[in-house]
C-alpha cells in the first residue's frame, strides 16, 4: 500500500472534519441575537439533525435551531431557549436552544463510529416491552435490565399480546415472568388489542418520565396508541410475515404527555440492546441476584463459569439463581467480546 494512501478510518475522519467545517461556516451568520426574544425554559420533544422541537411552559411546540456550542441534545433534555421574532419580510424565524440543564439520567447506546450515543435524557423509568410474538426473548429482557441497573433507572417489565395465549401458554409465560418477580422486578401482563391490564400500566406511568424499550414488533407503538388516545396516534407496523421480525416504525425519539399524567419517550425499536461499551464487571453488577454471592468465590479473579469454588455457580446449582439468567449473563459477555473484536478490527488502519 502506498504511504500516501489514506486508510478507511483516516478517510472517515477527514470527511467528518470537512462536514463539521461546512456546518460551522454555514451557521456563523444564522444566529443573530437580535432575531430572538427573551430566554425561557422548555423541554426537548424531539431532535431532528441540527433542529429540535421544544415545548414551552404553555404547551406550545417550537421548531428551534441549536447553538453550535451545545455538544449534546436529546429528547427529554430541559433547556433554555429563545423564540424567534418575525422577520421584516413577515417570515417567522426559528427559535434557538441556548443551553442545556444538567441531566438527572441519560439513556445511551453504543455506536461503532461515535462511541456512546445518547438516546434520551431525564427518564426515571424504563418500560421493557416484550411479547410472545415475534418471540419472548428473556435474553433481550436481561440486556435491558442490565442497562437499567447501570443507569440506576427503575425498570418495569411489560408483557404484551397476552390475548394470544391459551391457558397453557399463560401458565408457561407466568412461570417465565416469575423469574423476574422473584428478584424484585415488577411485571405487568397486558394486551393493547383487548386493553386488558392497561389500568395498572397507566398507574405505573403516572407522574413518571418513562421510555418504552424492546425489540421491534412487540407492540410498543400499539400500547402507546392505546394509552395516549387517537389524537396522538403513532404509526405501527405488524410483524413481518417473511422474517417473523418486527418492522421498524418510529424514526426519531419523541416525548408525549399521557392524559392521565406522566410523560413517555417513544424511541426507535431495536432488535438487540448493545452493552459492549460496558466493562464485564458492570454486567456482573447488573444481575441483582448475584450481589449476595460476589466476593465469596474461591478465587478473586473468578469468571463465574467453570471456575472451581464459584459461589454464583453453586447458587445456580442450588436453585437460588435462575439457570436462564445465569446462561444469559454469559451470552451477554460473549456477545460483548465478539462485538468488541469486530470493532477493533474495523478500527485497524488498512
From Swiss-Prot:
The coenzyme or cofactor needed here is:
Zn(2+)
- Residues that bind GTP: 160-163, 214-222
Q: Name one Pfam family in it.
A: RsgA_GTPase
| Gene Ontology molecular function: any one | rRNA binding
| Co-factor remark | Binds 1 zinc ion per subunit.
Q: Which residues form a coiled coil?
A: none
- Enzyme Commission number(s) of this protein: 3.6.1.-
Database matches in InterPro entries: G_CP_dom (IPR030378), NA-bd_OB-fold (IPR012340), P-loop_NTPase (IPR027417), Ribosome_biogen_GTPase_RsgA (IPR004881), RsgA_GTPase_dom (IPR010914)
Location within or outside the cell: Cytoplasm
Region annotation (Disordered) maps to: 1-27
The free-text function statement in the UniProt record for this protein reads: One of several proteins that assist in the late maturation steps of the functional core of the 30S ribosomal subunit. Helps release RbfA from mature subunits. May play a role in the assembly of ribosomal proteins into the subunit. Circularly permuted GTPase that catalyzes slow GTP hydrolysis, GTPase activity is stimulated by the 30S ribosomal subunit.
Its subunit composition reads: Monomer. Associates with 30S ribosomal subunit, binds 16S rRNA.
What the record says about family reads: Belongs to the TRAFAC class YlqF/YawG GTPase family. RsgA subfamily.
What name has this protein been given in UniProt? Small ribosomal subunit biogenesis GTPase RsgA
* Source species of the chain: Salmonella typhi
Which gene underlies this protein?
A: rsgA
Amino acid at each position: 500500500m502506498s504511504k500516501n494512501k489514506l486508510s478507511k478510518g483516516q478517510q472517515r475522519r477527514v470527511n467528518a472534519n470537512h462536514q463539521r467545517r461546512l456546518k460551522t461556516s454555514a451557521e456563523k451568520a444564522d444566529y443573530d441575537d437580535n432575531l430572538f426574544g427573551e430566554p425561557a425554559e422548555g423541554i426537548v420533544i424531539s431532535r431532528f439533525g441540527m433542529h429540535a422541537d421544544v415545548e414551552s411552559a404553555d404547551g406550545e411546540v417550537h421548531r428551534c435551531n441549536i447553538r453550535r456550542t451545545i455538544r449534546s441534545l436529546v429528547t427529554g433534555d430541559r433547556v433554555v431557549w429563545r423564540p424567534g421574532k418575525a422577520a421584516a419580510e413577515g417570515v417567522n424565524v426559528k427559535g434557538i436552544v441556548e443551553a442545556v440543564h444538567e441531566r438527572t439520567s441519560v439513556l445511551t447506546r453504543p455506536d461503532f463510529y461515535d462511541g456512546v450515543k445518547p438516546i434520551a435524557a431525564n427518564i426515571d423509568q424504563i418500560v421493557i416491552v416484550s411479547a410472545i410474538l415475534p418471540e419472548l426473548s428473556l435474553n433481550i429482557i436481561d440486556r435491558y435490565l442490565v442497562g437499567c441497573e447501570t443507569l440506576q433507572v427503575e425498570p418495569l417489565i411489560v408483557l404484551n399480546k397476552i390475548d394470544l395465549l391459551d391457558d397453557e401458554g399463560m401458565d408457561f409465560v407466568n412461570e417465565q415472568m416469575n423469574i423476574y418477580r422473584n428478584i424484585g422486578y415488577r411485571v405487568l401482563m397486558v394486551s393493547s388489542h383487548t386493553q386488558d391490564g392497561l389500568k395498572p400500566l397507566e398507574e405505573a406511568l403516572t407522574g413518571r418520565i418513562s421510555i418504552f424499550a424492546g425489540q421491534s414488533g412487540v407492540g410498543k407503538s400499539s400500547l402507546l396508541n392505546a394509552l395516549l388516545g387517537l389524537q396522538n396516534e403513532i404509526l405501527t407496523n405488524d410483524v413481518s410475515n417473511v422474517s417473523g421480525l418486527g418492522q421498524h416504525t418510529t424514526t426519531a425519539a419523541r416525548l408525549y404527555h399521557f392524559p392521565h399524567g406522566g410523560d413517555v419517550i417513544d424511541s426507535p425499536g431495536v432488535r438487540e440492546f448493545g452493552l459492549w461499551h460496558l466493562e464485564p464487571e458492570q454486567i456482573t453488577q447488573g444481575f441483582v441476584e448475584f450481589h449476595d454471592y460476589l466476593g465469596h468465590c474461591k478465587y478473586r479473579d473468578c469468571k463465574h463459569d467453570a471456575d472451581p469454588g464459584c459461589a454464583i455457580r453453586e447458587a445456580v446449582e442450588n436453585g437460588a439463581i435462575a439457570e436462564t439468567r445465569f446462561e444469559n449473563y454469559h451470552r451477554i459477555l460473549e456477545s460483548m467480546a465478539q462485538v468488541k473484536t469486530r470493532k477493533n478490527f474495523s478500527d485497524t488502519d488498512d
